[in-house]
């Protein structure tokens, strides 16, 4: 067929070219075999060199055959074909530029070039698509091969790197389309198929997910330019719009790619109308359809969001089309529209020079954003807060909106969604960082200047009014000037009742005369008198104008005053009753001409602006203060990200000088112990930022600031706070983040080289001690200086400083038990060291003086002695003997001076208290010393000895006598080699020797028991507290002694009238439960009983102790754990938070809460001892929130349904129904309810029960699948039928009752009322002293657990009045005979 006699039609599929079509339509004559393709391609290349691009007309079959066999041919042939076709199209493009300008071009030549153009483009584009398809398939096969390996596989398959070849092909097509090729077609109208061929190739390339990768950026740009040319020159807009909408719905990787392209078209190609078309198509999408098509909605949302970031001004013209989606169900579309609005506020509607229409548009957009801060979807609320944070950060939020948006953020802090809370905190932090008011935001500091400037403004206005009067102001203008202050005065007076005082209107006075007086008072600015007179006139002249028909409200009253002041002619004028009466209200009113010119007006305006600024700043600081109170409660949330945001917020608030920020900075301290590394690091960063980088001109100035700031944290700090701060400083010191200048200055203050107060010295020693934990040499190298600073004899003695010196010195050694195999013995000081000499002297001399600070000092002194001294028991025995000697001397002296009639000598109470307290401390520390230091040293030496024997080396030099003495004394030279032997030895010493009659400690036991057994005789609260705590410490030593005194301990725990004693004993018994679990286990119910103690202090302590014991598996978790559940509704927030934390931790221990729930529900809904209905709901809502597993839910549903059969009261029915309504039910849970319907069907007559089950139906419907709705409908129908007609078996019962519902059961005592008085808590008959537990042969009865490291701080003060009591010990008849021993094997226990 001659080239001039055929026409090439672009096919829809390659097969069409093989079929005969219309007249003169080109048809492929032969598909060449693979073996001939190389030679035919060479022939095509030769023809191209001779004929140019038109050679394709005769050799198209060769190219078609290559495309047909593309998968079968060699990679080299593919690459040669591609390179050749690129050359052909490039040559044709160059020639067409001159051919198209030739006016004399013949029809046959035009037709030949048109056919060649279509053939060349078709062949090149089909070849491009073939390469692309093969690359995509190779990528799918090699998904597991990443990086270079994947790319190498593709290169091996194709013979070259295709990704580098795409861009040149696309650029070649772009150059071709940029020519005016329309002239090749008749009527200069390019056929649609040709445009579709080129653009379709682009869209297919975009469908490849890898197109969004950074490495394909050049390809994306080439595609965008090619499509841009098609849009501009070939009327492709409609097709592009439809295609873009389709691709957004199906390809999630395309939104950013298409945004880049559309932005390019709108800016570089001037095709802004394409944006309108696309937005119109999206805007016309049905919201209901998008709620089902989540993939499409996601694509549209991402596209709109990024498009708004790129070209907000272009998109803004079409925003009205999108606003309907704000009411749609799909939250992603709402988020996208809101994000677009925010971008317009940021980039288009920002600045102070906006026109009025633009300002109105901005305000409308901000209104929309604020409204969606309360959206039903948490993701939308969160997004709004994020958008406002960006607006604030870029200072695009008008000042008038600050209060409203801050209030929105504060309100969202209480949101149920963690994400919303987190973003609310971030928004408030953005407000702080970008606030226009001040770098220091303190409402206390701002209140004074605000009042001062308000007073100044009032004076300026008064001067202005007086000047205006002399200038004969128009009454209307004068009225406007006085209106704000007049209205303010009126508002204050209207709040007060009208006083019945002296009448100001005489009987003969007329209404006109009174009007004149009112006018004069207003002119003199005597507003209060004028208002009082007018109020009286309205009641006196009820029939006279203008006082008749005046309502006692603000607007009517102002109208009346205005009418009196301005005259009757003002009655037809508009009322000013709605004018803003604020201090800045006159800014917008007409200016009153001043005799002195405009300077006075300018000053007044400036003053009004200043007052407005201070008012805004004051309001802002108040909102921030309110937010601080809410955010501080979020510091212990379970979500790490929220906690981190809270910490960052308080860092920022602290830097802005808000007074309440210090509370938050202190409150974050315990988070240093968090198990979450992110939280711990956030706390360290916060303190690093706040304290380690202070401002100052020199290193010393910075050190002074740092020490001052840290000292503020120590003011009134608790023991827990100090421990947390110590951990943080230890971390900083170990990382060398604390400068040497800081440590140097601390020593100078401690040793008084620089002037410092006693408190400053004390805080310096405390800080040195904290740092010594990280680097012991800080204190160890200056030990003598520290002893001299705090322990030298003074008058009076500073026990607070001495206590801190002891604590600091204690940090120079490791307090942990020595590890086995340690080469060097633990660090200890000789007995003769001056430290112990001074400690012994201060303890014995201070013993005879009633100084309350001596008690905590002697406790740390004894602890330090046992920690650092060689043979500390000898030193402490000397302390005890010295103090006891003073007591005996005092007794002898009193005996000689006492009245002969007295039967027994008296002793000052504080001496007996100090003696018992010291004895208790020594007893406990002796136990710790034996179990840690002595036991650890025995083990260390044994391991070293075993290593020597194992290596069969020559014996080392004989150890020092000081190291062998202990083994000789204990009889271990023969070589006990087992841990059990050493533990048995230590246990034997504790049980048989420490409290033996010949030992020092044993001498104090009779005295201690006498004080504890006779609370009526020894009634001093401090003495009782000290004695009870000392008894608890003595009981820790020996199992036999503990067993003999448990009855006395629990009697005091139950019946002591002093909350301090009960609290201390709760701690003591908790420690005993860990050390001697088998002995204490039968008494566990009495431990639980303290959870309902009437004293807040005792309940809190009991909650802490039981939390520790239960979570550490030290006591059996029984149904009595319901007492812990009751603490969830405790009126004291700290106790309720403690209980919540307990259940949070318990929920992590397997199925613990699930197993306990049935018993808890039974106990709390028990008519005899349960809680009221509302508290029950609160408790169960919290506990049931921990049930998240489907199997647990189903099992609980079945159990609760069965409980309906045994429930006795309607209250119990309601409780069970409520519990079921709180469970996260599934279809299987619903099936369980249907299977057990007869258990509760007859209870549905109760309205509350019925409502609870209806709420279950509502929850099930929300997440139900279509196939599950039938069973839900069936369940609801059964519920309604039983509610209205009852079960088949109860119709006669309903008839007998006359259709009336059963009466509600009487209400039970509230949770608070369960805190019974001490006299009625657990009668004596409830006490049972268990018998000693029988143990298995070969296993000692008193097998002990390792004692807890924690030790309660002694508290001796009590606000409770003491009562004379008789013996606190129970009689033998009260002693129970039952035992409930626990079988425990310490070796098998899993410790958490």
From Swiss-Prot:
Secretion signal span: none
Entry keyword annotation includes Nucleus: yes
Keyword line: Cell cycle, Cell division, Chromosome, Cytoplasm, DNA condensation, Mitosis, Nucleus, Phosphoprotein
Compartments where located: Nucleus; Cytoplasm; Chromosome
GO biological process: cell division; mitotic chromosome condensation; positive regulation of chromosome condensation; positive regulation of chromosome segregation; positive regulation of chromosome separation
Family: Belongs to the CND1 (condensin subunit 1) family.
The name this protein goes by in its record: Condensin complex subunit 1
Native source species: Mus musculus
């Amino acid at each position: 067929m001659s080239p001039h006699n055929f026409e090439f039609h672009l096919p829809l599929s390659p097969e069409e070219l093989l079929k005969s079509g219309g007249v003169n339509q080109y048809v492929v004559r032969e598909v060449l075999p693979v073996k001939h393709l190389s030679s035919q391609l060479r022939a095509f290349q030769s023809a191209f060199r001779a004929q140019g691009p038109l050679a394709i007309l005769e050799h198209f079959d060769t190219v078609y055959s290559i495309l047909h066999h593309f998968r079968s041919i060699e990679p080299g042939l593919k690459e040669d074909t591609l390179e050749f076709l690129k050359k052909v199209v490039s040559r044709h493009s160059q020639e067409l530029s001159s051919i198209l300008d030739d006016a004399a071009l013949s029809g046959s030549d035009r037709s030949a070039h048109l056919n060649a153009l279509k053939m060349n483009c078709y062949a090149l584009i089909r070849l491009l698509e073939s390469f692309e398809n093969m690359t995509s398939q190779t990528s799918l096969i090699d998904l597991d091969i990443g990086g270079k390996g994947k790319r190498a596989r593709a290169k091996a398959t194709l013979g070259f790197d295709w990704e580098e070849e795409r861009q040149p092909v696309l650029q070649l097509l772009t150059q071709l389309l940029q020519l005016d090729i329309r002239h090749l077609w008749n009527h200069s109208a390019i056929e649609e198929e040709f445009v579709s061929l080129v653009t379709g190739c682009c869209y297919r390339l975009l469908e490849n997910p890898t197109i969004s990768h950074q490495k394909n950026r050049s390809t994306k740009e080439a595609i965008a330019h090619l499509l841009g040319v098609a849009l501009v020159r070939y009327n492709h807009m409609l097709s592009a719009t439809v295609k873009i909408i389709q691709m957004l719905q199906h390809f999630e990787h395309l939104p950013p790619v298409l945004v880049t392209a559309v932005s390019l078209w709108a800016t570089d190609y001037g095709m802004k109308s394409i944006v309108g078309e696309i937005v119109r198509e999206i805007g016309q999408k049905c919201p209901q359809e998008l709620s089902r098509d989540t993939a499409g909605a996601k694509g549209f949302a991402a596209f709109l969001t990024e498009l708004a970031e790129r070209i907000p001004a272009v998109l803004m013209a079409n925003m009205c089309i999108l606003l309907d989606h704000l009411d749609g169900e799909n939250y992603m579309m709402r988020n996208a529209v809101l994000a677009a609005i925010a971008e317009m506020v940021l980039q288009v509607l920002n600045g102070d020079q906006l026109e009025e229409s633009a300002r109105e548009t901005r305000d409308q957009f901000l209104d929309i954003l604020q409204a969606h801060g309360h959206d039903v979807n948490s993701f939308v609320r969160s997004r709004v807060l994020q958008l406002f944070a960006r607006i604030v950060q870029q200072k695009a939020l008008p000042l008038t909106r600050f209060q409203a948006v801050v209030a929105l953020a504060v309100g969202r802090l209480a949101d149920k969604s963690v994400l919303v809370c987190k973003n609310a905190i971030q928004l408030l932090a953005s407000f702080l960082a970008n606030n226009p008011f001040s770098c220091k935001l303190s409402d206390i500091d701002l209140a004074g200047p605000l009042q001062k400037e308000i007073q100044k403004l009032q004076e300026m206005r008064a001067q202005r009014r007086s000047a205006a009067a002399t200038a004969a102001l128009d009454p209307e203008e004068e009225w406007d000037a006085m209106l704000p202050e007049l209205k303010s005065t009126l508002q204050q007076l209207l709040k007060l009742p009208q006083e019945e005082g002296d009448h100001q209107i005489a009987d003969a006075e007329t209404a006109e005369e009174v009007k004149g007086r009112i006018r004069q008072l207003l002119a003199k600015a005597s507003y209060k008198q004028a208002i009082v007179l007018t109020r009286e006139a309205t009641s006196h002249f009820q029939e006279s104008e203008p006082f008749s028909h005046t309502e006692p409200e603000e607007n009517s009253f102002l109208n009346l005053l205005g009418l009196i002041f301005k005259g009757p002619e003002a009655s037809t004028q508009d009322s000013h009753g709605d004018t803003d009466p604020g201090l800045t209200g006159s800014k917008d009113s007409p200016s009153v001409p001043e005799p002195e010119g405009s300077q006075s007006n300018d000053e007044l305006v400036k003053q009004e602006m200043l007052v407005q600024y201070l008012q805004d700043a004051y309001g802002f600081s108040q909102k921030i203060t309110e937010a601080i109170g809410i955010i501080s409660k979020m510091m212990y949330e379970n979500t790490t990200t929220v906690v981190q945001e809270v910490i960052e917020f308080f860092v920022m608030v602290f830097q802005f000088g808000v007074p309440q920020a210090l509370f938050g900075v202190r409150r974050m301290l315990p988070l240093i112990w968090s198990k979450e590394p992110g939280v711990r690091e956030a706390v360290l960063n916060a303190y690093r930022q706040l304290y380690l980088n202070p401002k100052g001109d020199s290193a010393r100035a910075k050190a002074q600031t740092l020490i001052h700031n840290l000292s503020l944290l120590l003011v009134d700090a608790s023991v827990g706070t100090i421990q947390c701060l110590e951990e943080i400083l230890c971390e900083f010191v170990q990382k060398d983040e604390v400068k040497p200048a800081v440590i140097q200055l601390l020593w100078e203050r401690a040793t008084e080289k620089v002037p410092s107060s006693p408190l400053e010295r004390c805080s310096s020693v405390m800080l040195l001690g904290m740092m010594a934990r990280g680097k012991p040499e800080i204190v160890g190298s200056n030990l003598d200086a520290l002893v001299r600073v705090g322990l030298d004899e003074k008058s009076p003695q500073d026990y607070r400083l001495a206590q801190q010196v002891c604590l600091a010195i204690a940090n120079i050694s490791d307090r942990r038990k020595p590890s086995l195999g340690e080469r060097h013995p633990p660090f200890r000081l000789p007995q003769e060291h001056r430290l112990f000499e001074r400690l012994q002297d201060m303890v014995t001399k201070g013993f005879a003086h009633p100084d309350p600070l001596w008690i905590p000092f002697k406790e740390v002194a004894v602890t330090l002695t046992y920690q650092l001294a060689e043979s500390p028991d000898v030193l402490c025995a000397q302390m005890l003997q010295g103090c006891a000697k003073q007591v005996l001397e005092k007794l002898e002296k009193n005996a000689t001076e006492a009245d002969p009639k007295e039967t027994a000598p008296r002793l000052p109470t504080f001496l007996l208290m100090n003696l018992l307290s010291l004895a208790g401390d020594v007893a406990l520390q002796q136990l710790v010393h034996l179990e840690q230091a002595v036991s650890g040293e025995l083990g260390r030496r044994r391991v070293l000895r075993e290593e020597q024997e194992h290596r069969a080396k020559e014996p080392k030099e004989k150890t020092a006598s000081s190291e062998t003495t202990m083994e000789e004394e204990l009889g271990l030279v023969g070589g006990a080699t087992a841990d059990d032997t050493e533990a048995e030895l230590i246990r034997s010493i504790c049980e048989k020797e420490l409290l033996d009659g010949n030992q020092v400690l044993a001498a104090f036991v009779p005295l201690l028991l006498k004080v504890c057994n006779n609370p009526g005789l020894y009634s001093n609260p401090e003495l009782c507290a000290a004695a009870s705590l000392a008894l608890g410490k003595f009981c820790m030593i020996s199992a036999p002694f503990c067993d003999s005194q448990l009855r006395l301990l629990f009697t005091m725990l139950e019946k002591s009238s002093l909350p301090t004693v009960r609290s201390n004993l709760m701690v003591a018994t908790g420690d005993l439960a860990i050390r001697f679990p088998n002995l204490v286990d039968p008494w566990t119910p009495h431990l639980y009983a303290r959870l309902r103690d009437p004293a807040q202090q005792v309940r809190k302590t009991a909650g802490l102790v039981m939390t520790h014991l239960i979570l550490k598996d030290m006591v059996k978790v029984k149904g009595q754990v319901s007492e812990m559940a009751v603490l969830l509704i405790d009126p004291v927030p700290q106790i309720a938070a403690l209980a919540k934390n307990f259940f949070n931790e318990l929920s992590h221990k397997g199925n613990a809460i699930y197993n306990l729930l049935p018993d808890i529900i039974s106990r709390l809904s028990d008519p005899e001892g349960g809680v009221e209905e509302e508290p029950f709901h609160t408790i169960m809502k919290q506990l049931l929130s921990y049930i998240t597993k489907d199997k647990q839910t189903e099992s609980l549903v079945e159990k609760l349904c069965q409980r309906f059969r045994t429930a006795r009261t309607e209250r119990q029915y309601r409780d069970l129904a409520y519990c079921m309504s709180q469970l996260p039910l599934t279809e299987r849970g619903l099936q369980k309810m249907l299977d057990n319907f007869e258990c509760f069907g007859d209870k549905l007559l109760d309205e509350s029960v019925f409502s609870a089950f209806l709420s279950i139906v509502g929850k099930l419907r929300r997440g139900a699948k279509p196939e599950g709705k039938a069973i839900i409908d069936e369940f609801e129908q059964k519920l309604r039928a039983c509610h209205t007609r009852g079960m088949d078996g109860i119709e006669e019962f309903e008839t007998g009752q006359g259709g009336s519902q059963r009466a509600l059961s009487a209400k039970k005592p509230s949770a608070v009322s369960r805190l019974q008085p001490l006299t009625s808590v657990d009668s004596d008959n409830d006490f049972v002293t268990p018998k000693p537990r029988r143990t298995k042969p070969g296993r000692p009865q008193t097998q002990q657990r390792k004692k807890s490291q924690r030790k309660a701080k002694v508290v001796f003060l009590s606000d409770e009045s003491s009562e004379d009591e008789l013996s606190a010990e129970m009689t033998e008849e009260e002693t129970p005979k039952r035992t409930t021993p626990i079988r425990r094997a310490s070796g098998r226990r899993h410790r958490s």
